[in-house]
């Protein structure tokens, strides 16, 4: 590159030949390349620039970077700006990052950590002596060469660029390594290069424990914890495994007060890094990467072994005998038509939310804020979430000794035992709001923990828009008695108006490749058989659309594991095993599959594209290899596509909800003696823990649902329904309030009713299924009635499960199903067949039904889906 240019405009491919892609991230892709003139290898980061991103400041960083030449710093070769892509050329480090390495090898040894820490400190000492900060020390940014040399990467120009790019998607991932003074910069008034020394201590823990402290917590909550005055620096968890010297080194690096924290020069004199440490330690580590010993490191729990009985990896659908007659129900399935399923306001609208929350409109105002630093983005996020005002107040927050490093505080005094607790009413509601009836269940003596994340400010009201229509002209305005409208409908309409003509042309018409949709008619769907003779004992079902192929898959959770069925290949129908452990619950969020799996009934998070790729790889293995025993045993962490969510063992029930007021999505799990609440973090594409509430669960736990209420950050958790006691109150919701900082004690003096289903259709509309009756009530448990909506629907059978359609409720019982109109309580559809036993397997996106013969309930089952609606998924 011509040294006269700070940012070359020539074609970089004239100087470098791209060999292979070696990494990718939210910023772009990293390639291994070769200089065509010298033959020298290089690492090239290719970043696609978005409109409005200003990189004028980067040129100044490039000039500064030219002077940075040190054995422990990745050499900078130059940068190219070509069309809308920025190419950053750096020294190639063939050993990879320490994060990549420990994902394969497991924890580093103490001497290896000492060697890496010493080399890192030497690089920081050089940077600090030149008046520079790294600002992003962590395992992912410490690289090894093929010869075992340690190099610091992603600082200077890369740090500035990454900080700018990261505001789009990944700005939230860094707080785990962030020093307290950086987290509280607005109150503390700035920070200096000593923040890098804090990150060295956190990285040492990361290399020893495979993740930084608080990594299982929501990033914003971890950031908030660090700003508290009683925050205690983290320590190594295992006191006996590591030497006193290592413990003391971590303690010195993690000195909370930056004025007392040692400099890089001072820390280089610590006995932990002055002991004899040679490059052979890193070479041994690289050898372990290239020849991993899977017997010494694996990512599984001994209490969750492989299935004892080998089950088929591939299950073909059996062919029906030509002379075999269809059952009476199957004949009716082809004749009875159903209207589309109702999209609830509290249902996480995955694809829509992804574009709305992180689309261009949002980026231009927030993520693409010029050349602001990563820190500034985090500050803005704190402002947006209402945390800043709370940063100045260190009192009144309960302790979270299990997850954080705060000193224990005395919990606040318990309030007097209330008879019932009022729910804030919408100002537009015409209901009497004097008597609140959502009731908090008795909780344990300890307060709900933790509530360190302060409540977000109430969101602004949505502008008036056309109410969303529910079925035959029953709008949400009519259903609610208030002008709330359907958030899903409003957002989709708004999204549609914002699309340019070009974008509309580019959008493919078919949402998925599967069963063909029917024309847009009032009732155009029917149940279609998709599998004949299924031997699995299925507990649940959902569906997913592959973003690359657009093929639609059914995903089943069964005793035998997680299986999938491609609806685009029904001509050669077969189920494929995705995961070998028992599964009792499934939910898909974007490309992430959540499940309750394994012997210990623990929550898992699976990467769906990775899970499908891995299943295909297993099919190519020799038949002699027991593939069902492979996943957790031999798969390195780096490539693991299934991960257990910590602290979620013995999960009985789960539910997912979206808060229509804020757009945030929550996953709640009922454990044996507690409740866990997790929030979806879009940049990280996973649910992360925000609350762990000790609570004695009812036994048996018949129902477990979340209810979103106005002006509350987190949804209430409904664990039961009892008879109403107040005037006009037909039901009373027994709830646990995650927003409370103390325990609420209320005595349940009325027995629970036999409730089979509770679902929140809209903000103040809840459907409660009791025995043979369905009641539509508000948050206070009072019936909602109008000229266009029946408040009660009655059936002549014991309801086992329901699906809400746009005009009706479809109730399932042992030998069939019946639909009744929301308006008139009249029967809209009915299928009955005493020769078959029916069971609803799932209704998220796709309604999936199972059928077995009555005279042989253990026989193989037939599977059906409600198909035919345009845009159904």
Swiss-Prot record:
Domain CNH: start-end pairs: 535-846
Domain Protein kinase: 16-273
Binding site for ATP: 22-30, 45
Biased composition (Pro residues): 452-466
Any Gene Ontology biological process: protein phosphorylation
Catalytic class of the enzyme: transferase
The reaction(s) this protein catalyses: L-seryl-[protein] + ATP = O-phospho-L-seryl-[protein] + ADP + H(+); L-threonyl-[protein] + ATP = O-phospho-L-threonyl-[protein] + ADP + H(+)
Modified residues (Phosphoserine): 329, 377
Modified sites of kind N-acetylmethionine: 1
Entry keyword annotation includes Transmembrane helix: no
Entry keywords, A to Z: Acetylation, ATP-binding, Kinase, Nucleotide-binding, Phosphoprotein, Serine/threonine-protein kinase, Transferase
Pfam families according to UniProt: CNH, Pkinase
GO molecular function, one term: protein serine/threonine kinase activity
Gene3D superfamilies on file: Transferase(Phosphotransferase) domain 1 (1.10.510.10)
Catalytic site: 136 (proton acceptor)
Function: Serine/threonine kinase that plays a role in the response to environmental stress. Appears to act upstream of the JUN N-terminal pathway. Activator of the Hippo signaling pathway which plays a pivotal role in organ size control and tumor suppression by restricting proliferation and promoting apoptosis. MAP4Ks act in parallel to and are partially redundant with STK3/MST2 and STK4/MST2 in the phosphorylation and activation of LATS1/2, and establish MAP4Ks as components of the expanded Hippo pathway.
Family, similarity comment: Belongs to the protein kinase superfamily. STE Ser/Thr protein kinase family. STE20 subfamily.
Identification of the protein by name: Mitogen-activated protein kinase kinase kinase kinase 3
Organism: Rattus norvegicus (Rat)
